Amino acid sequence: AAFPQILINDLFELTTKQKEEANYNVQKAIEKLRLFQLADGSFSYWPGSPSYSDWGTSYAGHFMIEARKAGFRIPEDLIQNWYKFQKSKSNLSLKILKQTEYWYPTNYAYRLYTLALYGKPDWSGMNQLFLVKTENTFSKMLLAGAYALSGKKDIAESLLNQGPLEFKAYRDDFYNFGSDIRDQAMLVQVLVLLEKNQEALGLLNKIIKKSNSDYYSTQEQAM
């Protein structure tokens, strides 16, 4: 799980050897990404697979962006091809976004979040999803994060204030590999973007307490 190791230096005091090991693991993960990238810039879930993973593609981009911010070198063609694919898939119609599958708006919101994190927000896509008024808490958080990253904190706050943010226990091992804990960890990031540090700290403490007894997936650790 290389993603959590990108930020490990900021979270813990590590020995020189531990830092070197973490950096090595991140660099090797970056090198392996080519095995997963398809010709159109998307990423598959398994090396050599001809099919792309919707969530996995956004996750790969998220990893590359955070790694670059942390000082790791990301091959320009790798991330540029990813961006071109994300951009091509980011402007969907309201009809498609209103599909009943819970994972569809969530995956779409994550794509918009990563584009905003990359510094190239898709305003049309964000506004389309905003109009859908999804009741999915995680989708709202990701969209709020996209607006916050793009300088529209007022819109981000309005999304979070639409109703109570409920986190029912769940685990998804197919569509977006998530859980209620992963979703709450993502909310911590959004709250920090909105400078709601006390709320973020309170939620983070709850997550940490739960981590003492539960097994965490890669997604949960990374978020």
Enumerate the language-model features and the residues they cover:
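Large, well-folded core regions of big proteins
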Residues: A1-M223
